[in-house]
């Protein structure tokens, strides 16, 4: 079947697109990506059947949308028309993603099972793989992953990451010009909210709470004392300002108890709402505060200033440094009652946000073109990799067996020093044993002396002698 015939068949059904990430946890930013992808691709492709894949299956009855378990991917992969990897901070190899979070089966590697493995499966089936602006965050890429990462990137139809540090990290594994830096796809959330039903639901929540404008959104998390202390200190200067505490990442332990309970005028939600309702609540505020990356992005896309507790010079947060409405928290002990009010206030999104949306428009247009182009023949790349696999494994085994010569010499030196220390310890123990024996002998002799008749007989003489010494003194 040629590409024309294949596309003709697809025109008679929905486009089947899989998106991969951590969509099975209560984390605001992660849950946005499938929603945005479906909205953007439906505008361009018509009927789209977007299937989020994560470790654990979820039902739309009690989750924002249905999620398929990654355990089903081997069965479903051949029916997909495209694969989106991410976004979010998913290009990682450490094991701690969230408390208790892991794969549903031991044969799924953690954590590459939800990003690297799907890209490899896509390469196997010739399904176009699009890296949907995921990212890294100051993390390492282990040696064992290099061949697999190279194959996945080489076989991908489009590679977009969300910041320069991520691009720098991935460039050694593919032709550098193929890695593109794009804004996080959540920068389009302001546009996606227009005419969305979530705006009405957010308004109903505000009415039920009695929350009126203006209000400040504070992420219910740690390390925001500088802001809450400032608000308490100058509460009389901001009498009409309400504070809405939001859990952006319950899975990462966000909770209202982290925020000073003495802060007046605060409101909390009784239940965690859908991601789009959270976005609407954020977008309706006059400012937001917290460390969440997607709290900041959502606010910026709606023209809302941000007070961030994060270091904008590190990792993923570097992408926020170019926005002049991203501010640090108030300085320690700030005495300026106008410091906060001078920086608050929702306005039209900045020109940087407008440019980000223009880039995302072009990105989604390109993604739609890639999807329409259909599957590709990736057998050459996968066959070459399989032929190289024995050599890769053998080299890895040799590396593990041989080790670094300098390290081996160092280990031998440590062993020799350990033996010397053990000998010295043995000698010290022998000396201690001899001293202990002699001490016991002396104690026995002293006890026998005190119990002897001569000691008892001479006791009056010793007392008289001590009395005479006292007189002479």
Report each predicted region and the residues it spans.
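Short intrinsically disordered, low-complexity segments
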Residues: 432-434, 462
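Active-site anion-handling motifs in enzyme catalytic cores
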Residues: 2-424
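Short hydrophobic helices that act as membrane-entry/anchoring signals
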Residues: 444, 451-473
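Bacterial/eukaryotic Sec-type N-terminal signal peptides
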Residues: 1-4, 437, 473
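Alpha-helical coiled-coil heptad-register detector
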Residues: 406-409, 413, 420, 427, ...
